[in-house]
């Protein structure tokens, strides 16, 4: 959005995340332009590692960098998850401020990264293409891997309860790197920790689970207890909804690249997604991944026209 780009000329991303007034403003900007049913808080999944003592930044050449490499037992032991609420109060404040500006009929979503996804960034030292270090840790030093995952899981549980207390109506867990797990290890390396988090939330709010590239693992994803499965664009919604039945609602799954094309292509693809989803309750239209910076406003407007028209039909 132009208004977001204007803010970015004055403040960097991390500064906006850490400043409640700015984070709330960015959260609300899309709501002023488009007839959306829900807002998602402006933040980043890496606020958890930062709260534990491992900061993050954006590399000049692109991608995410962690302030140091989590490569020894001493460094993992030093991660402190006892001050989550204190260190992440700015997120709670941003949620409360955003909630106060939204209407009663508009939901506010909080979110976090899954323990596995966060561990990938922390152990690899940031964005990577091969994920060698995190797999080596999980295989070669399972006790140390377990320690890291437990610290992350406990911190996330506290963080999500804090988000609910601050006004979040629902929560989304992003297991963005679950797809790099060997098929035989996905449950033990990632899903069991997600299951524990959802169990500890005790049904306070609905939980959405997004696992990129894991459409073939939907039966296992459902075992986490998530209320809603968020699917990427590689999944056929019709067949997936038939296999899920009433076990969970479904969210998705327009390819974000569509919004960089033309309004006509956007309308066509949006109608295709809606047709695949069918007319049964339990479907939330969304993108299959995050918005691409080069998305065109006129395409977003075309998307809103189609989805809103379908909803009101």
Task: Annotate the PLM regions.
Residues 5-17, 73-84, 222:
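Short, basic, glycine/proline-bearing loop/turn elements
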Residues 38-60, 70, 77-84, 112, ...:
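Glycine-rich, proline-tolerant flexible connector loops at the mouths of alpha/beta enzymes
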Residues 1-54, 58, 64, 196, ...:
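N-terminal basic, low-complexity leaders that serve as flexible interaction/assembly modules and, when applicable
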Residues 61-101:
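A gly/proline- and charged-residue-enriched helix-loop-helix capping module
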Residues 38, 67, 107:
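Short, flexible active-site-proximal loops enriched in glycine and acidic residues
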Residues 2, 87-313:
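Active-site loop segments of alpha/beta catalytic cores
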Residues 19, 71-78, 130, 262:
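Intrinsic-disorder/low-complexity, polar/charged segments
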Residues 54-69, 121-134:
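Short, flexible, mixed-charge acidic loops at enzyme active sites
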């Amino acid at each position: 959005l132009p208004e977001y780009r204007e803010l970015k000329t004055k403040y960097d991303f991390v500064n906006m995340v850490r400043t409640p007034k700015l984070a709330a403003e960015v959260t609300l900007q899309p709501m002023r332009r488009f007839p959306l049913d829900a807002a998602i808080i402006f933040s980043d999944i890496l606020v958890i590692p930062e709260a534990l003592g491992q900061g993050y930044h954006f590399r000049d050449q692109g991608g995410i960098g962690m302030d140091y490499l989590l490569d020894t037992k001493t460094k993992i032991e030093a991660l402190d998850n006892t001050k989550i609420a204190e260190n992440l109060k700015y997120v709670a404040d941003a949620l409360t401020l955003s909630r106060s500006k939204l209407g009663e009929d508009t939901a506010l979503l909080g979110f976090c990264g899954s323990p596995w996804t966060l561990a990938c960034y922390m152990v690899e030292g940031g964005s990577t293409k091969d994920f060698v270090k995190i797999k080596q840790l999980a295989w070669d030093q399972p006790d140390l891997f377990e320690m890291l995952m437990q610290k992350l899981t406990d911190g996330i549980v506290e963080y999500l309860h804090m988000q609910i207390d601050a006004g979040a109506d629902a929560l989304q867990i992003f297991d963005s790197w679950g797809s790099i797990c060997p098929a035989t290890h996905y449950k033990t390396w990632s899903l069991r920790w997600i299951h524990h988090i959802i169990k500890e939330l005790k049904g306070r709010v609905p939980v959405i689970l997004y696992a990129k590239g894991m459409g073939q693992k939907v039966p296992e994803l459902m075992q986490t207890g998530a209320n809603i499965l968020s699917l990427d664009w590689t999944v056929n919604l019709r067949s997936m909804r038939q296999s899920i039945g009433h076990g969970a609602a479904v969210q998705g799954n327009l390819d974000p690249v569509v919004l960089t094309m033309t309004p006509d292509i956007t309308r066509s693809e949006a109608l295709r997604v809606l047709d695949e989803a069918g007319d049964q309750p339990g479907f939330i239209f969304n993108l299959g991944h995050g918005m691409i910076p080069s998305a065109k406003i006129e395409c977003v407007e075309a998307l809103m026209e189609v989805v809103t028209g379908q909803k009101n039909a």
